[in-house]
Structure formats: structure tokens, C-alpha cells
């Protein structure tokens, strides 16, 4: 996977971390997410909180290979991992008691990728 065209060092590091975890654990999930982040930025997912609230259940682990935006409200207690969060999304997630973090943090906690849902 070629990440030499990425300008952001943080993004390059995130992709490399996910690829390494995928190799070590044998999980194709983290490899797929790393490939999605290595693609063009126009192809990144942009997911609103209302969509997460609509499709997720309490206790779910949701991964968004892109951006989480703060449109809508969230009433379920979920863990959300994404490349970036908007300010309003972070505020609404923390106010509702949800956990949010980088994708690599979720991958380190759950290297096999069990019970993780990708949302686009």
C-alpha cells in the first residue's frame, strides 16, 4: 500500500499502524480500513451522528473511515472510531456518554476486529 502521496504525517502513521495490526492479527478488517484511508480524500466517508444513531445499537463499536459530522442527535451509547471528528460531533458524543477515538486506538484494543461495524 503506497502512502507516499499523503501529506499528513498523522494520516500516514494511522495507515501504517492499521496495516501492521492487520498483518499481526490476520484481520482483514483493519487492512480494508487502511486501504480506504490510503485512497483519495474525496472517497472518504462522511457520516452524520443521525446515521450512527439510526443503524447502531447500544454497545456497538462503529468505525468510520473518514469524518464524523455533528448533524443530528445520538441517543445510544456506542464507541465511535474515525479519522476525524467535527467539533459539534465531539461535543454531542461526549454529552451523550459515548466514547470516541482514533481508528488505530480501537484496532489496538480489538486487533481481531470482532463486533466492529464499518459505517460509510
Swiss-Prot record:
Ribonucleoprotein recorded as keyword: yes
One example of a Gene Ontology biological process annotation: translation
UniProt keyword list: Ribonucleoprotein, Ribosomal protein
GO molecular function, one term: structural constituent of ribosome
GO cellular component, one term: cytosolic large ribosomal subunit
Similarity comment: family membership: Belongs to the eukaryotic ribosomal protein eL18 family.
NCBIfam families, A to Z: PRK04005.1
PANTHER family: 60S RIBOSOMAL PROTEIN L18 (PTHR10934), LARGE RIBOSOMAL SUBUNIT PROTEIN EL18 (PTHR10934:SF2)
Name listed for the protein in its UniProt record: Large ribosomal subunit protein eL18
Source species of the chain: Thermoplasma acidophilum (strain ATCC 25905 / DSM 1728 / JCM 9062 / NBRC 15155 / AMRC-C165)
Protein encoded by which gene: rpl18e
Amino acid at each position: 500500500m503506497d502512502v507516499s502521496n499523503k501529506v499528513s504525517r498523522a494520516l500516514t502513521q494511522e495507515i501504517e499502524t492499521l496495516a501492521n495490526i492487520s498483518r499481526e492479527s490476520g484481520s482483514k478488517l483493519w487492512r480494508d480500513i487502511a486501504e480506504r484511508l490510503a485512497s483519495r480524500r474525496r472517497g472518504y466517508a462522511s457520516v452524520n451522528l443521525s446515521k450512527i444513531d439510526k443503524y447502531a445499537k447500544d454497545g456497538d463499536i462503529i468505525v468510520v473511515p473518514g469524518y464524523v459530522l455533528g448533524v443530528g442527535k445520538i441517543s445510544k451509547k456506542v464507541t465511535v472510531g474515525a479519522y476525524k471528528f467535527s467539533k459539534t460531533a465531539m461535543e454531542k458524543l461526549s454529552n451523550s456518554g459515548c466514547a470516541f477515538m482514533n481508528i488505530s486506538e480501537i484496532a489496538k484494543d480489538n486487533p481481531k476486529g470482532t463486533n466492529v461495524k464499518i459505517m460509510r
